Amino acid sequence: ATGVRYREKAGYVRIGTDSSVVTLTAGAEMATQFGGTIHHYLGAAQPMHLPGGLREAFYAFVAKGGSDPTDGDGYANASGNTVGAWRFALTARSRREKMAARLYYDHFFEDESAAFDEYGWLDGLIGLELSLPLQSLHTVVAEFVRTDYQSGPVYHDHTPQLEEQVSGIDNYYNHGLYPGWQHFGMAMGNALFASPLYDHNGTLLFT
């Protein structure tokens, strides 16, 4: 893909200050790739030009609306490639010992069902950061990430015969039109995602 546009936004609320004994932070971050030209889509000789004007910029901002040329009749995907995360952190401090502990959780999503708990928040990153009053060891961080649930193992678009919508198989960081959430084969935004560069299979797909 060439000429792709990018929009990023974030918003947070914090209860407490840097000097409070307990601080709670909660918010969300979202980023969208949209517009540009897609080359060799399914082996096509002609490039596919995707709209990237003000309307699509608005769709990218609200993460809703729009479509792309590959949508079937009656099926409209949101414009562009959107990723995001709900982020929460709880920090506790000991003023006397100059110690602090921060427990944090990131729930990442790529569609509306994952963003709004339609199938449960089973994928995400949970971490613990300890700040110690030692010169030789100042900070200890432990993190665990899970990505194998992906809203379940089934994806089914609603049809007149079967109206139920099942929005599983989120396939994190991959996209049907854009070459994944990577830069020169390296994952962006999450160090615990295995980058496509290391697969040595000639693709930019996250597996």
How would you label these PLM feature ranges?
Residues R7-K9, R14-V22, R55-G72, A89-R93, ...:
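Elongated scaffolding segments in large macromolecular assemblies
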Residues P69-T207:
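Outer-membrane beta-barrel pore domains
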Residues A1-A44:
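Internal, well-ordered domain-core segments that constitute the primary functional module
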Residues T2-R7, T37-G80:
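Primarily recognizes Gram-negative and organellar outer-membrane beta-barrels
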